[in-house]
Amino acid sequence: MNVRLKRAKELVGYAVQLTKDEGLPTMVKRGAGFVKRRCFGKRARYLPAKKVLEAQRAEMAGKTAADCGLPTISVLTPLYNTPEKYLREFLDSFVGQTAPNGQLCLADASDAAHGNVERIVKEYQQKNQQIVYKKIENQGIAANTNAAAQLATGEYLALADHDDILAPHALYTMGKAILQLRQRGEPDGFLYSDEALFTKSIRRPMVAHFKPDYAPDYLLCCNYICHLAVFQKALWEQLGGERPECDGSQDHDLFLRLLEKTGGAAHVPQVLYYWRVHAGSTSGGADAKPYVAAAAKKALADHLTRTGRTGTVEDGLFPSTYRVKWDIVGEPKVSILIPNKDHTEDLEKCLHSIWTKTGWEHFEVIVVENNSTDPATFAYYKKAQQRYDGLRVVTYPKKGFNFSGINNFGRKYATGEYLLLLNNDVEVRSGEWLTELLRQCAHPGGAAVCGAMLWYPDETIQHAGVITGLGGYAGHSHKYKKAGGSGYMFRTATVQDFSAVTGACLLVKTSVWDEVKGLDEAFAVAFNDVDFCLRVRDAGYRIAWTPYAQLTHYESKSRGGDEKDPVKARRFAAEQQRLYEVHGKANILHDPYYNPNLTMDREDFSESDDLRGLKEGRITVQWRE
């Protein structure tokens, strides 16, 4: 079938399905956005407007690296048999920077048949004295990069491949971001930006990688940082540069070692780097360079050793992803709290799956009875306690439903070092679910809270982490996405850092629960889990989510919202307002583990229809530990 015809049929099918799932108004809005981007906004959509670039050039007119007021950034680029077209485009991107605060350090290991590489570079040196060049013997990518670093005189270093392109405002933006960090008194040792992939022209990019702020668990699963990374030269020298034994994943290894020194990184949500996709490039996938995986696993294993943590590094669910199976310290007991009102069929399915599928043996289950009215429920409780050794049923003394109050009451009876909040309409799928949740928490430097992958019965995602700000308040990552995919930038296939996870399945250290005083009972139904996780985060702890703990959540996709009942609608609105009051609207709307260039209207990680931050060249930077 003709490729264009096939694509057209796919788009029509998508439009029909979207209309069925979300209604005609949503389909029309999405369609209008698609047409706008495709026909009018596709070109150069990640570049600042022409007037913004001109203003930057005017600001820097007549200035040099020494007097422009920005820290000098030396870009390290090893050359090896670089095709002329790619080389010229790369050099043009450096020469065309809007600020003069750059130095380009080229270490050329090209063979004798590619003497034109040196000739082309020398041609460009006539245009720009900030280009320095050295001919070297080829010793591999890490050693060649180290050779380029020996030419550097800048306070900062950056890494760029010889076939890629720097955005015209890359060095200006990074220089300004460093100054912002200094003005705020924040660490400025390591920064990174967003990037885009392209084939022919950066004015027609394929896709952007809009990254979260520094996310340590995510980085252990894949090198999401990539380009453009900028770091202090002094740190590079302390580390001894890149390690040849990690060739193929030398940058990932470097970033891990840098972070051991800095304790965190700063993220600039601007597309400052264009990564060319072609045969043989890592942007085209791990299959292009098979040795990458072995090098990455070595880098990760060495990082664990250096940081005093123990675990096994394995291949992840998809190429270019990895999994750290942390060693659990001790044999911690988990107290599973399950609120229940009638619905004994759901509860039995839940309990049966726990006792028949859970590999971790050290747990207790506490069912918190909440105002059941069916006599059969109490008969079931007696039978269940005989059937399931260690099951206890305790009775919540207050009337009405208050999820927070019920779980706070259940905690009084818990004896475990960890608490697990679990809905009664959840069924265990994988035997290692509880073990995996503990792996993320019960090791030195682990998270305080961890959530699981929850599936609807039709094998679409119900929960893969919570993003604050979606829809104005909070939403679930990749909700309704079908099984089999990896999500945006592998985010449903790798352990993730999140601001919150759902209380339908939430593991937390009991000591942390007690420290933040449990759930806030002012959030009776909605946002209690979000509020809890944000308070845990504010106390200095991390929230993790893992795809390796899998459960089915029988929550109905078509369940009606609280807006249909006036009383419930008022309660829901009050809880929404309280979320803003407690945590601040600005904080809710800016989730550090999301990206301002992604949509706030949907849960699918699609690109925002509003990219004004990019078009205006808006410089914001956030440092995070």
Predicted regions and their residues:
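Glycine-rich, basic loop-to-helix element that forms the pyrophosphate-binding segment
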Residues: I136-A152, Y396-A414
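A conserved acidic beta->alpha catalytic loop
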Residues: D108-R119, E369-Y380, E427
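C-terminal, non-catalytic tails of nucleotide-sugar-dependent glycosyltransferases
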Residues: N2, K6, G13-C68, K289-E331, ...
